[in-house]
Design a protein with these regions (language model features):
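Catalytic-loop of the protein kinase fold
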Residues: 142-159
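Glycine-rich ATP phosphate-binding loop
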Residues: 7-34
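C-terminal lobe substrate-recognition/regulatory segment of protein kinase catalytic domains
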Residues: 285, 289-308
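Activation segment/activation loop of eukaryotic-type protein kinase catalytic domains
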Residues: 159-203
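Conserved end of the kinase activation segment
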Residues: 210-222
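Conserved N-lobe beta3->alphaC-helix segment of eukaryotic protein kinase catalytic domains
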Residues: 32-54
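Short beta-strand micro-motifs within the conserved protein kinase catalytic domain, predominantly
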Residues: 61-77, 85
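Activation segment signature within eukaryotic-like protein kinase domains
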Residues: 130-131
Length: 308
């Protein structure tokens, strides 16, 4: 897969620590970052330092880190981590996951392999456990003075023993870190305990203050809590069926090869989000205010006094 500033690969490995850390045996996750391509606030060197410093059952583990120099002008950082088999996105997009009181569907086929791995018997137990473990991961980071700043379903994985793992500290912020605002100038009344770069987070999971780039910074820890809430809300939003052709060949292929047998496509779904970010930040802000209402005073939303 590819992120904004990185590429992620599935790599073979003989490291025994992979299994110990709940990863798929014989494989590792290899994240590669070209240090000259990354842009603020992405910082692979800080990410490595944070992964080396932190240790929690619900956070990913850094098994190794090294650099490559394919040419005199390029330095690529390589982060080796366990390859976890399930992404929360896969769970949320499953048609077998419905907010009902009856037991979850039997894990009898590949589509429901996540059920077999996670071992939950009711919808309530799945939601409760995910919430508890994600809260524990975030609480640990915040206790260490670290804000994640990109909490979303695709950054939440599950190990082979069903343990939730929060990954990707690429845009994380620390209380000891003095972040340079996009303007290049620190506000005279801004403190070092604020984060300033608002271009963090992803889509519908971004806190509303990030959409308006407050001049005096924002509370990155509160932004994490907002993201936590929007992620957990996804367990209760609508499951939408993808609009795809019912057959696996386009019309022009059917014209050229009329004798080719037609095979129906499997049904696929995706989980809607609490707020709609499909049309950009303005639409997202409007949707947030439509659901939550507008704040009635600056004390309810201090950053609002310095929106740009």
């Amino acid at each position: 897969g590819h992120g904004l500033c990185s590429s992620v690969y599935k790599a073979r490995t003989t490291l025994q620590a992979v299994v110990k850390e709940g990863g798929v045996a014989g494989y590792a996750c290899l994240k590669q970052v070209d240090i000259d391509v990354q842009n603020a606030p992405h910082d692979v060197q800080r990410e490595i330092a944070l992964l080396q410093r932190t240790r929690h059952a619900n956070l990913t583990v850094l098994l190794a880190a090294f650099t490559d120099t394919p040419d005199p002008f390029t330095t690529i950082y390589n982060l080796v981590m366990p390859l976890y088999p399930i992404q929360l996105t896969d769970v949320l997009d499953s048609p077998h996951l419905q907010p009902v009181n009856c037991p979850l569907a039997d894990a009898t086929n590949e589509e429901t392999s996540w059920l077999r791995l996670l071992g939950f018997h009711t919808y309530a137990s799945l939601v409760s456990t995910c919430f508890q473990q994600l809260m524990q991961a975030i609480a640990y980071l915040h206790h260490e003075g670290i804000a994640h700043r990109d909490i979303k379903p695709s950054n939440i994985l599950f190990s082979t023993d069903g343990m939730l793992k929060l990954i990707d500290l690429g845009v994380a912020w620390e209380v000891t870190m003095r972040e340079l605002p996009p303007s290049g100038l620190y506000p005279s009344n801004g403190g070092s305990d604020c984060a300033y770069i608002s271009d963090v987070g992803s889509g519908a999971f971004r806190a509303p203050e990030l959409l308006f780039a407050p001049k005096n910074g924002y509370d990155a820890f509160k932004a994490d809590i907002w993201s936590l809430g929007t992620v957990m809300a996804s367990f209760f939003t609508a499951l939408l069926e993808d609009e795809i052709p019912s057959m696996d060949y386009p019309p022009w292929e059917r014209e050229l090869f009329p004798e080719r047998p037609m095979r129906p496509r499997p049904r696929t779904c995706h989980r809607s989000t609490l707020f709609d970010s499909s049309s950009g930040d303005i639409t997202l802000a409007c949707d947030i205010f439509k659901v939550c209402g507008l704040p009635s005073s600056v004390s309810d939303w201090p950053e609002a006094a310095h929106f740009q």
